[in-house]
From Swiss-Prot:
Function noted in UniProt: Catalyzes the conversion of N-formimidoyl-L-glutamate to L-glutamate and formamide.
Top-tier EC class: hydrolase
Pathway(s) of this molecule: Amino-acid degradation; L-histidine degradation into L-glutamate; L-glutamate from N-formimidoyl-L-glutamate (hydrolase route): step 1/1
Catalytic activity: N-formimidoyl-L-glutamate + H2O = formamide + L-glutamate
Family listed: Belongs to the arginase family.
Protein name, as recorded: Formimidoylglutamase
InterPro entries assigned: HutG, Ureohydrolase, Ureohydrolase_dom_sf, Ureohydrolase_Mn_BS
Length: 336
């Protein structure tokens, strides 16, 4: 793999060490193993972490750049969190997108994801939300290589203030794939393959999406819930709808754009939310998804922008989300 796109495990994991507690004092930095992704099948079951250092898609979408620096800062915030699982984490390194080489970087990221999914689930640390096209492409490649006999029913669940259904090509304007286009790209791919497109977008902001994007979502039968409707008073109804969505799918891909949270909670994002959805209101939906660990194969966290963070609070939020997802994925083995 070209060194231009891939930095092999250069992050140095370190953190607090409580020697008096022995193995019971384990933290993430104690259990994470940096390995070559081609050797993942030789190791015990765990969860793989893969960085995607890229904000070329954000730049193309006319957003605030800075997300390229995020994977290692999420790792740093993750390193000191307590680790209770008997299963390890595997750090596969970071795919780096230099200049505007977005498509090539996405292909490299997808290749790595496809190669490790037969052995372990994957959490990708973005980067802008262009990571979603890389993540899904890797998942799709996995199914094409290992289960070509049947079209997979993949449920895509996106916590996001934006649909990210913008056009990725046009004869009337100079348009390229960006952080605003991944789910339109995914739908186009599914259509070409004859796969159903199951897309849920939770926390979408009516103020941040044009009428054209809402019409596109309706056209594609996207199940969405606006930010203002994710309050606790509506939890039971929307959780039931989420359960129906999950039941209709055989596999789940979870993607979290940190701009779904209020700017006061997540200031370090490419597009801060004036309203957003509180962590407390979002948590029951995340918990419901993680309860279906048998279906959850892939997740990513996107749009952390450390340039605008305050006291690393957005990094800590991203790390906690990663920690929650990784624990659920590792629990899969305990419940088999």
């Amino acid at each position: 793999m070209s060194k231009h796109f891939f930095l092999h495990n250069e992050f140095h994991w370190q953190g607090r060490h409580d020697a008096e507690d022995g193995a019971a004092g384990s933290r993430v930095h104690h259990v994470v193993q940096q390995i070559d992704y081609t050797h993942i099948g030789e190791n015990p079951y765990g969860v793989a972490l893969l960085g995607f250092a890229c904000d070329a898609g954000v730049a193309r979408n006319k957003g605030r750049i800075g997300a390229k620096k995020s994977p290692d800062l999420i790792r740093r915030a993750l390193a000191n969190l307590a680790w209770h699982s008997p299963h390890p984490l595997y750090d596969l390194g970071t795919v780096v997108c230099d200049d505007d080489l977005l498509e090539s970087s996405q292909q490299h990221c997808a290749k790595m994801i496809a190669e490790v999914l037969p052995s372990v689930p994957v959490i990708t640390l973005g980067g802008g939300h262009e990571v979603a096209w890389a993540s899904f492409s890797g998942l799709a490649r996995y199914f094409e290589q290992h289960h070509p006999e049947k079209a997979p029913k993949i449920g895509i669940i996106n916590f996001d203030a934006h649909f990210d259904l913008r056009a990725f090509s046009s004869s009337q304007a100079d348009i390229k794939p960006s952080s605003g286009t991944p789910f339109n790209q995914i739908q186009h791919y599914c259509q070409q393959q004859g796969w159903d497109f199951h897309y849920a977008c939770l926390g979408v902001s009516k103020a941040s999406n044009t009428r054209a994007l809402f019409e596109r979502a309706e056209q594609l039968n996207v199940w969405f819930v606006e930010d203002k409707d994710l309050g606790s008073v509506n939890h039971d109804y929307h959780l039931t709808q989420l359960q129906h969505f999950i039941d209709d799918c055989d596999y789940l891909y979870l993607t979290i754009d940190l701009d779904v949270f209020p700017a006061a909670t997540a200031p370090g994002v490419s597009a801060p939310a004036a309203r957003g959805v509180s962590y407390d209101n979002l948590a029951p939906f995340l918990d419901r998804i993680l309860a279906h660990r048998d279906k959850l194969m892939l997740a990513d966290i996107a749009e952390y922008n450390p340039t605008y963070d305050v006291d690393s609070q957005t990094a800590r939020l991203a790390a906690r989300l990663c920690w929650d997802i990784a624990n659920a994925m590792n629990d899969k083995l305990e419940h088999q």
